[in-house]
């Protein structure tokens, strides 16, 4: 069977990538109306202006593209201009996190997807693979399985 990725990660992005051989499940997980939370750890270089973060919770338009609500928390202030942020979005548009960081005047040094909906990267090492149990799938995706049956 063909293996498909749910969503995508840019070439310079690392972290959680969901794989499936079920095309309907892949589509369900990507549907914008399901608004799965995507959470990223982002190492940035630059000055983080906390006053600019709060308005992003209502969304923002950058270069004619409307981005929905964006929540940014400062996880760790680094030395000088290095900082780790936690960015939470629900749309996952192409290069969304990078575009938002550029809008804030920040340069992305590292971008790691750590959550996609109910699925969490946790301690899985780079290149590691973990099968999602049927029980977890059914408990997290009741809407999907309710339509198709188990």
Language-model region placement:
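Basic, flexible Lys/Arg- and Gly-enriched helix-loop patches that mediate nucleic-acid binding at interfaces
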Residues: 1-150
């Amino acid at each position: 069977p063909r293996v498909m990725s749910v969503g995508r990660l840019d070439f310079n992005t690392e972290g959680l990538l969901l794989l499936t051989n079920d095309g309907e499940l892949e589509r369900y997980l990507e549907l914008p109306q399901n608004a799965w939370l995507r959470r990223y750890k982002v190492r940035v270089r630059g000055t983080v202006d906390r006053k600019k973060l709060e308005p992003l919770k209502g969304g923002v338009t950058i270069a004619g593209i409307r981005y929905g609500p964006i929540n940014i928390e400062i996880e760790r202030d680094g030395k000088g201009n290095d900082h780790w942020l936690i960015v939470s979005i629900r749309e996952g548009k192409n290069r969304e996190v990078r575009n938002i960081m550029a809008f804030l005047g920040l340069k992305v040094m590292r971008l790691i997807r750590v959550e996609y909906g109910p699925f969490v990267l946790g301690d899985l090492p780079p290149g590691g693979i973990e099968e999602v149990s049927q029980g977890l799938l059914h408990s997290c995706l009741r809407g999907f399985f309710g339509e198709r049956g188990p």
